[in-house]
């Protein structure tokens, strides 16, 4: 391959410049939002901005301040002023170098972050080429697995496709934007070394059948027989082919030599990677189980392994969540994508080292999870919620195309969306004391045509917490699950919804609709506030819980995921890095509700004066 473009072509000059401009615009916007630096307006209308850096370089650009406080930066307006010269901006790493002193980035951290940024730009070049001729309407019509190939990625992380550990050939083979398929590599693993957890109605044969047809199952069993593997002593584990080549073949060589792990080869249906890289979907059977597999690469702030500590409780916890959803009328729009099985094989030595870097303890495991397609009736389809703000080459977002196709107005369509997504997530918190980190990858919107009618949620191992209070509703959750999951104060669970869903998904959705459709963001958040207030009015029995989990406070936490990387660098650690906190944000729900109330009061006064 000569480069990442279709047919293996190298990156072209003009597209490279455009990709870099977009990356600089994103860095300026998100790092200013995180208070890593402070651009200043140059005019009273706050349309032209200036960023002065400690290096002596100044950047100027056009931008619009949004309701969350971030700036929507126009990439084509960016200019760099240095040594009396004004030049257009077309180098994202050069911007990072200019800002390094201001951002307090050490030289080692700068170089490694630049590696992540270059990898991201390479992936973005591929995405831009693949998406060039597709309108927002075209994108909206694609099946979810195909659409995920064409998305920009994490909206808050400029280096969202860092994938440290992969080269161009690995990107081409395993990254979603390249459109390739993956066949699972299989190991036979000694049962006395492997932790297996199954839902009550799930057997090992059904797990095999979700990834292999009958012919492939027979081939795999023949390979086991040839290797002398007994199913009495060993179980079959799928692994990501890169993980076998890049990590397991060497790091677990002693287990292979002892016969506790037996490599069998690649078998089964073709799978495609989703946005998270680790989760793979079956291309032949959309309703077949997805598999989540460790890939020991650094991507979007963390090593992408699969921890073993939640493996034993995954099927039980997700089954309990699904039961709550089935029997609670307020949760009817919600479907839990159950983790029907999990297996984990600990490393014989790393596992026993106190405070060992976490990536060495998460190398070999698998989670089998339901596909969103398994829950769908005719005419309904899934769409990753993070796809809604995605824009086409003209700047039109997918959400605009869906609203136009639905025949509904903006407010009515958004009311349907919030009723399908925000209300069930909030109800789970208030009724059951469960808080989900509901970011754009973990939440799947269910569409009936172009209208939101439901939501599917996933990833409960580390992305769901329980309230630290004695909610009676939690007593039906088995004790060993309650002891394993983290217990958090109400404010922390509330932050999961405010940060994971509102500030990480809705912030960009309202920005896209304001930017392209001209929808006032106060209308957007007044619609959300109105839908949540209607839900609260329907459940007066939860009034004390609503006070405990108050979404309408004037201020909300500001979470910073980028500046924490600049501060801590890339050294090994026993746990994943935690985000940093900035000054509190003005809560858009409070802003919108207050503005709506003020307008209603003004209308009432005017009406009274006219009588």
Model regions and ranges:
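Nucleotide/phosphate-binding site architecture used for ATP/NTP-dependent chemistry
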Residues: 1-420, 447-611
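Intrinsically disordered, low-complexity segments enriched in polar/charged residues with Gly/Pro
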Residues: 266, 430-433
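A short glycine-rich, hydrophobically flanked beta-strand micro-motif that places a catalytic Asp/Glu
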Residues: 432-446
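An amphipathic, hydrophobic-aromatic interaction surface with interspersed Lys/Arg
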Residues: 419-431
